[in-house]
């Protein structure tokens, strides 16, 4: 059983993956709040409580974090609480198998890399990956499996919260689908702007990529979405053909499998 940990700015996804290669399957997944000051002991207490008896069945662990301080604590947690379990952390120097054709490869978030790796592995073609997180990342992988870059925009919830925080007349609202694109009250107006507005943003970016990037105008380009808020927005997005809830976890597994031989026997 592989333990996969995906730490983002606001939330952390913990998954258990059985099998490997084409037989791999995410059997459990949890989403918890990210605490930027959490210690290795606190992380271990939380994760051990989630995975329960499967803690004794772990054959490997893999993690990424967009929060540098948490990355260190996750590594420390694995070394202290599961010392006999080989683990891989996604960071510079780890083999991902995906060339980064950008100005500064070290700037590229680990989440973006593993998403593109998973998309290319699944479809075997050029792909556009849309990750609906605290930021919306629209990333591009070539037909050769190369990371070409992408676009980053504020996420749906982050933008809605920012609007409420900076305006005395607005308040934080629950992000649900409004009755119409034309809101009849302030809450519906904010919901409309968030949901339909970001659906248009995603369509605009995907269409622009198809127009501007050589080789991306054809039907053989896969467009896949992932992320917690994706199901909320995708019904109004016209350019995304696939949704994969486990895309990041699958990418983490792929990186672990590429690096596990060097991790065997690690103490």
Swiss-Prot record:
It comes from the Bacteria. Its EC number is 2.7.1.33. ATP binds at residues 6-13, 134. GO terms for cellular component: cytoplasm. The keyword Lyase does not apply. It catalyses: (R)-pantothenate + ATP = (R)-4'-phosphopantothenate + ADP + H(+). K(+) binds at residue 131. The active site is at residue 111. GO terms for molecular function: ATP binding; metal ion binding; pantothenate kinase activity. A monovalent cation. Ammonium or potassium. Pathway: Cofactor biosynthesis; coenzyme A biosynthesis; CoA from (R)-pantothenate: step 1/5. One of its GO terms (biological process) is coenzyme A biosynthetic process. Keywords: ATP-binding, Coenzyme A biosynthesis, Cytoplasm, Kinase, Metal-binding, Nucleotide-binding, Potassium, Transferase. Substrate binds at residues 109-112, 186. InterPro entries: ATPase_NBD (IPR043129), Type_III_PanK (IPR004619). The keyword Nucleus does not apply. It is an enzyme of class 2 (transferase). It holds the Pfam family Pan_kinase. It is found in: Cytoplasm. Its main location: cytoplasm. Catalyzes the phosphorylation of pantothenate (Pan), the first step in CoA biosynthesis. Homodimer. Belongs to the type III pantothenate kinase family. This is Type III pantothenate kinase. The lineage of its organism: Bacteria, Bacillati, Actinomycetota, Actinomycetes, Mycobacteriales.
């Amino acid at each position: 059983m592989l333990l996969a940990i995906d730490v983002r700015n606001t939330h952390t996804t913990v998954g258990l993956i059985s099998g490997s290669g084409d037989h791999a399957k995410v059997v459990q997944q949890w989403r918890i709040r990210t605490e930027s000051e959490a210690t290795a002991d606190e992380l271990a207490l939380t994760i051990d409580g989630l995975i329960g008896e499967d803690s004794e069945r772990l054959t490997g662990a893999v993690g990424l974090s967009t929060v540098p301080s948490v990355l260190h604590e996750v590594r420390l947690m694995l070394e202290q609480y599961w010392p006999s379990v080989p683990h891989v952390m996604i960071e510079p120097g780890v083999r991902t198998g995906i060339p980064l054709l950008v100005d500064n490869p070290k700037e590229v978030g680990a989440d973006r890399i593993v998403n593109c790796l998973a998309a290319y592995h699944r479809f075997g073609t050029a792909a556009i990956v849309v990750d609906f997180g605290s930021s919306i990342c629209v990333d591009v992988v070539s037909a050769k499996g190369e990371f070409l870059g992408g676009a980053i925009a504020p996420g749906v919830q982050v933008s809605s919260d920012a609007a409420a925080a900076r305006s005395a007349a607005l308040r934080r609202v629950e992000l649900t689908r409004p009755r119409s694109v034309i809101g009849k009250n302030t809450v519906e107006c904010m919901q409309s702007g968030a949901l339909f507005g970001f659906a248009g943003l995603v369509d605009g970016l995907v269409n622009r990529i198809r127009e501007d990037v050589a080789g991306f105008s054809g039907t053989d380009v896969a467009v896949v979405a992932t992320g917690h808020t994706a199901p909320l927005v995708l019904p109004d997005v016209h350019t995304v053909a696939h949704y994969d809830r486990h895309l990041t976890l699958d990418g983490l597994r792929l990186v672990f499998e590429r690096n596990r031989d060097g991790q065997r026997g690690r103490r």
